[in-house]
């Protein structure tokens, strides 16, 4: 063991802890002593050995530290904050002027898709309560498929029990749907993704609308309405229910601006909200990038992916609202660390090394880690060790809640699942699909990320809710499986090529003899059925999870759909991810020089 400390290889510096004030009570002092950061004494035990290691040849990040530190936005100025507050006040007044139920539903839909719903939660809830509790038999439930579908989708989204039988009025004597109205079909298609298991009417609605939308897209009729054409294309690619709110907002603002019935008040507020959030994200990225650079992981562990900005995109997608800054910080760093550890287990580490690393995480013993781990693993382990302890100390200080055991166990579950897959690879074992998924729902990081989201984004932490999350409830189980399957659809080809354990597609092919095309379609069908299970849970009024925690979980799954829809958006940095990262994080939406008109009601033409 070397007796000197090399400053350039410290896993984390004391500077990372300068922002932490002294503990204010005896319990906190004791905990802080337990959580103090550790410096790395590099061991040469393994470093001189020649080991044949695989390489994934990952490309470096296109967003480097210097670029992130150069970010600067005008939207942090007080003038913009005052203007945004003024606009929100005007919108609240205008919302009260919208009387007709259909106009109210369209207003809510616009608020959600423009990224403004979190600013008007009370107003939205009041409107939906009135619509749901109104015993009046609205005419649209028999005559207007668009309105009926919109009402169904919004009510189910917000947890109101609505029967699928509201659509019986739009079926013929043979039970088939009757509709030649494109707007109604599109609305029904979006509503069908809120279906539950066993709802035959909603399944028929999905089949009918999917077939019809594909036929229309093939035809040339869509040239008459570019806006509807773009909506149809995106709906077939990914429904609204599966889209990340912040990503949808950036696209919808652009589309909404082109609409003849746009409301200028909502449009300006949406642009202002997006730009001010983007300014917040940029400041957060600068701080996190400094932390990441101090660890030295990106520089020293060159075999691993350096995906800090992609990691931030995940955290922003999970918790985009301004009040979740600390949650985004913890999630971003966690996902960046997960990425490095994943590459160690998938590509770089030997099986013996991986078993020792797993043992070190289970022991959570710094002396054991320093004695037994090779140098590159010391850096990774100590970065994880110090960060988890910093996180635990921060929450203890803020809430007098010791989360160390919970977060350690969550990380250990992931590491153990990684080891299972590494053993499968080294033994050339191909599991059956169900066996693969039971381990894969953990190795995809779903349980860990939702635990981190809850612990970093909740104040106060509720012990009962945390224990429920730790029990692997159905909503975590099925959401994580969807995450796993979507990841496999986007990454399996690249991962198999560079040498990795068979993914769900290959497992199904091996188990059934199916072609890859058939296997991929089977995986897609599985995901849609799993979403029905998730929908049932979110509709459960007796759930111990808060709405915020549930939304964290749903947004994690939605982010997986985005990241892996066109390939490996996290690891390979495909063009879709690069473009979205640029528009979301670095490119503000232009505002008009003069203030826009404020007279029109948000739900109607402006």
Swiss-Prot record:
Record flagged with keyword Metal-binding: yes
Motif annotated as DDXXD motif, chain positions: 342-346
Residues the entry annotates as binding Mn(2+) 2: 342, 346
Enzyme class: lyase
EC number in record: 4.2.3.20
Binding site for substrate: 342, 346, 484, 487, 503
Domain comment as written in the entry: The Asp-Asp-Xaa-Xaa-Asp/Glu (DDXXD/E) motif is important for the catalytic activity, presumably through binding to Mg(2+).
UniProt name for this protein: (R)-limonene synthase 1, chloroplastic
Localization terms from the record: Plastid, Chloroplast
Residues the entry annotates as binding Mn(2+) 1: 342, 346
Record-linked SUPFAM superfamilies: Terpenoid cyclases/Protein prenyltransferases, Terpenoid synthases
